[in-house]
Amino acid sequence: MKKQSKILIVSHQYLPHVSPRTTRWKLIIDELTNRGHEVTLLTGTYPDFENKNINVIYFGNKNNLNIVSNLREKSKRAESKKLRTKFFYSLLKKIYRFFIKFVAWPDYSMFWIYQIFKNRNNITTDYDVIISVSLPFSSHVVAYIINKKKKKHWIMDIGDPFSLKIDAPENNRLLYSGLNNHYEKKFYSLANTILFTHKNALESHKKYFKIPSKKLVVANPI
């Protein structure tokens, strides 16, 4: 990486969403900006925080950040009203959960990918390095869309397995296991550097996807 680079970080999850991953990347971004790098964050999480040191590009619906919670709240408010209204919101919540569990690809944030694709010409391509952060895997799909023509240095940060995830898979494996494997393997072949926070995860992905050792790095968690 250059002494002072323009870095585009693609992470669907970021602050104020709290998780080990968002906390880790907040610390990394702080370190990058302290070293003089120019950082732009592309996210699907409404940036309800002061962002003096970075540029934030947000695509999403800030009025509906969590559809299930939104529907649950409306269902509660409907308790004192008509039973039919309460049933309607409860049904919508179940339909949404069914869709995310059995139909959505690659994961719950598939509509964010659509928003990025629709607005791709409005997203900056003035960067030296692009970094995509999962989970969700959608962040890597978005980075691929943006970097497809630019072909700048691509760093993938793998927080959790995608195709190799056995418990609580990100999508319907009966429908999408082939698609999962195809795109994960494709992205690993295109990325210049692939980060894993655990050596065991690195080794299992290296073996399964036949990733060259020179691309792989064990990056420290928090």
Over which residues does each language-model region extend?
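N-terminal subdomain of nucleotide-sugar transferases
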Residues: M1-N66, T193, K199-L202, S213, ...
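Active-site proximal beta-strand in glycosyltransferases
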Residues: I7, V129, V133, Y144-K165
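Membrane-proximal helix-turn-helix segments that form the acceptor-binding/catalytic region
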Residues: L27, I113-N119, S138-V141, I145-K149, ...
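Active-site-proximal region of nucleotide-activated glycan assembly enzymes
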Residues: K152-H153, E170-E203, K207-V217
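Short N-terminal targeting/anchoring amphipathic segment
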Residues: K86-F88, I116-S139, K152-I155
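A conserved catalytic-core segment of Leloir-type glycosyltransferases
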Residues: L42-Y114
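A short, histidine- and acid-enriched strand-loop-helix "catalytic/donor-clamping" loop
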Residues: L15-H17, Y114, K118, S138, ...
